[in-house]
Each structure stands twice: as C-alpha cells, then as structure tokens.
Amino acid sequence: MSRPNSVRWLNEVQWDDQGLVPVIAQEAASGDVLMFAWMNREALQRTAETGEAIYWSRSRRRLWHKGEESGHIQKVLEIRLDCDSDVVLLKIEQIGGIACHTGRHSCFFQRYLADGSWETVDPVVKDPKDIYK
C-alpha cells in the first residue's frame, strides 16, 4: 500500500452511526473469506498507510493491529469499497496462515446442515494456547 496524499477518499465511505464500517478480509491467493471485522476512519486510514490490516475492536474500544499478539498479521494488497460504499473488502496475504483467534485459517469454519445443526469443517492449525502466551 502507499501513503495517500490526502484523506478525502475516506469521505466516500458510508460510516454507520457509530463511525464504523464493516470489513471483510479475503485471502487474495485463494479467494477464501477469512474474517469479518469493523474499522473506524483512523483504522482504515492507517491500514492504507501501513499496508497492514488495522481494525477497530468494539469490545476493547481501541484500534487493533491484526497480529499484534499472535504475529498473524494481514498484509493488505488491495482495498475495495462495495457498490453502496458501506462495506470494505481487504484482499490480503495472511501471514502464518491463521486468521482466527481459534487457531484456524478462517473464522468461517462452521457449516450449516439441513438438520439445523452446525458442523465444524476446518481444522485447528495451531492451538490458541500456543499462539497467545
């Protein structure tokens, strides 16, 4: 990513009433959807400037540099805005191959079955106890 000369581009994003926009992180090489998170204006600006995904943690009420604890950073290759300008898509390279705090490649590891249950379909790549020491 490169350092934008101005921040006018941020004005084109349709922020919600809390100043947030939903963000989808998609692995560029495979097309896999890895996670969903939120960004505020500062997070999106810093993501564009640094080339690494920085989100807004609603639970911690602070910026969250993805991988700051685990080392599983997301290198941002492309930032896209949807047709309504209210969802951001990050095309990323997932360092370490793990995006989910459960130790899986993707946060979307549960599949709905016709009987109304959920099935875990993706394995744990690394035990979270070994990631977050």
Curated annotation (Swiss-Prot):
Zn(2+) binds at residues 83, 100, 107. InterPro entries: PRA-CH, PRib_AMP_CycHydrolase_dom, PRib_AMP_CycHydrolase_sf. Mg(2+) binds at residues 82, 84, 86. It catalyses: 1-(5-phospho-beta-D-ribosyl)-5'-AMP + H2O = 1-(5-phospho-beta-D-ribosyl)-5-[(5-phospho-beta-D-ribosylamino)methylideneamino]imidazole-4-carboxamide. One of its GO terms (molecular function) is zinc ion binding. Catalyzes the hydrolysis of the adenine ring of phosphoribosyl-AMP. Pathway: Amino-acid biosynthesis; L-histidine biosynthesis; L-histidine from 5-phospho-alpha-D-ribose 1-diphosphate: step 3/9. Its cofactor is Mg(2+); Zn(2+). Belongs to the PRA-CH family. Its EC number is 3.5.4.19. Gene3D superfamilies: Phosphoribosyl-AMP cyclohydrolase (3.10.20.810). One of its GO terms (cellular component) is cytoplasm. One of its GO terms (biological process) is L-histidine biosynthetic process. This is Phosphoribosyl-AMP cyclohydrolase.
